[in-house]
Amino acid sequence: MSNVLVIQSSILGSYSQSAKLLDNFAVEWKQKHPTDNIVIRDLAAEPLPVLDGEIIAALGGNGELNERQKAAAELSLNLIEEVKTADYVAIAVPMYNFGIPVQLKTWIDLICRAGVTFSYTENGPQGLLVGKKVLVVTTTGGAHRNTATDLALAHIQAVLSLVGLNDISVAYAETLNMGPEAQERGLAEATKAIQAFIAAH
């Protein structure tokens, strides 16, 4: 039995293409692996606290903590534990104004912790969350792949690499706002990549 962590990050609810793609992934994965444990964390439905001075001090373990800081530090460790125990991680990464959703950025801020999920060495940072396979499902309204504006995918890949998640597959659904035919092609391509990931594992 494997553990699968699914991270939803879209704010669009039932209108979200990335959410639909990732929901379909979870359903198809369960059909192939009925005994696997799937944990779904919806960052829009259950928002995380945004990083601020108090929280970053708590994550650094600086001094006596107030109740809010204690809760944030505990939440951070719980989020990290979800990743640690997962064999597979699937993440929805819709592009908003060339970046990632703030909800996803907040999750990143709570799991990227020096000495916990990565360490600094004389050769640079070394990730500590190794040995996992990741599926990134990214959606864009326009055509950005392999261009300077493909910033959402570049961001999440850099962050995942920082913490040791280097085995990354990408399902890319682009041109979703460029007409019905372009949308259909984009979704079909992403669906094919998702199915290939499932078939390979």
UniProtKB/Swiss-Prot annotation:
The cofactor binding remark recorded in the entry reads: Binds 1 FMN per subunit.
Q: Which family does it belong to?
A: Belongs to the azoreductase type 1 family.
Q: Indicate what this protein is called per its UniProt record.
A: FMN-dependent NADH:quinone oxidoreductase
User: What GO molecular functions are on record for this protein?
Assistant: electron transfer activity; FMN binding; oxidoreductase activity, acting on NAD(P)H as acceptor; oxidoreductase activity, acting on NAD(P)H, quinone or similar compound as acceptor
**What does the record note on quaternary structure?**
Homodimer.
> Which enzyme class, named as a word?
oxidoreductase
Q: Which UniProt keywords apply?
A: Flavoprotein, FMN, NAD, Oxidoreductase
Q: Which InterPro entries does this entry report, sorted A to Z?
A: Flavodoxin_fold, Flavoprotein-like_sf, FMN-dep_NADH:Q_OxRdtase_AzoR1, NADH:quinone_OxRdtase_FMN_depd
HAMAP family given for it?
Answer: Azoreductase_type1 (MF_01216)
Q: What is its EC number?
A: 1.6.5.-, 1.7.1.17
For FMN, which residues are the binding ones? 10, 16-18, 95-98, 139-142
Where does the source fall among the domains of life? Answer: Bacteria
Q: Keyword Oxidoreductase on this protein?
A: yes
**NAD is among the record's keywords:** yes
- Which cofactor does the UniProt annotation name? FMN
| Pfam families recorded | Flavodoxin_2
Q: Which reactions does this protein catalyse?
A: 2 a quinone + NADH + H(+) = 2 a 1,4-benzosemiquinone + NAD(+); N,N-dimethyl-1,4-phenylenediamine + anthranilate + 2 NAD(+) = 2-(4-dimethylaminophenyl)diazenylbenzoate + 2 NADH + 2 H(+)
What organism does this protein naturally occur in? Tolumonas auensis (strain DSM 9187 / NBRC 110442 / TA 4)
**SUPFAM superfamilies on file:** Flavoproteins
Give the range the annotation lists for the signal sequence.
none
**Protein role:** Quinone reductase that provides resistance to thiol-specific stress caused by electrophilic quinones. Also exhibits azoreductase activity. Catalyzes the reductive cleavage of the azo bond in aromatic azo compounds to the corresponding amines.
